[in-house]
Amino acid sequence: MIRILQMAVILLSVPMIVIAFYSHPSVDDYGYGSSVHLWIQEHGYHVFGIIKCAAEFAYEYYFKWASSYLDSFTGALMPENFGCYWISALMIYFLLTGGMLYLFQSMAVSLGGKEYRWIGTVCALTGIVAVTQNWPSSAEALYWFDGAQSYMGYHAVSLWMCSALVMYMFCGDKKRSIRLLVVSCVLVFLAGGGNNVTSFMDVLICCFFLGCAVLLKKKWGIVFPLIVSIAGFLLELLAPGTAVRGGGDYN
């Protein structure tokens, strides 16, 4: 069964990977990537300068238009600025499928033990086939960088976040629990910076795990990812750019 599903995923992935090499920038890609593009033309490929330029662009957009505190930053680093637009689709695809695989395996191992890892693998591969063959628009999901990274990219980060939270809830080693808690907080912050929907979902997910902690009467450290998720959501909700995009005034 696993081999059949593995072959199905590989065969179904080939066309999507090939198409990635024919994708090209469009619409918001130019708006978000223009500042870094101009900086590279003037100063060349200097890593810290490019990061600084992208951060300045994100800061400006946070107050003027886009409330997401990380989306504008990653959008400014459009791969076409570096001559490799095709890599964006591959990064998002493997980040998403890897997140699904890791999440289901984490659940299977945490609930049943390592001997049940294969169940998680089967569920993940089945889910990957279902998702990749049924999304409304593969162009927006993978091949349009700005839209894909804003939604699918940060959704994929949420999957990795859920994996870390699952492993934390079932981890019996204190030191490993602390490491998983730190990783969870980092991933919660990153996932929440993509868009309002993902940010709010992260709050709900952390609330669910807090409910599990209440039932189990342990793992109260889950409060820290919850606090981070709420802080991230408020960063987006209360951003000046939110009022601008929603029709408010900006002075």
What are the functions of these language-model segments?
Residues M1-I2, Y116-R117, K175-L180, L215-V228:
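Membrane-interfacial entry segments at the cytosolic side of transmembrane helices
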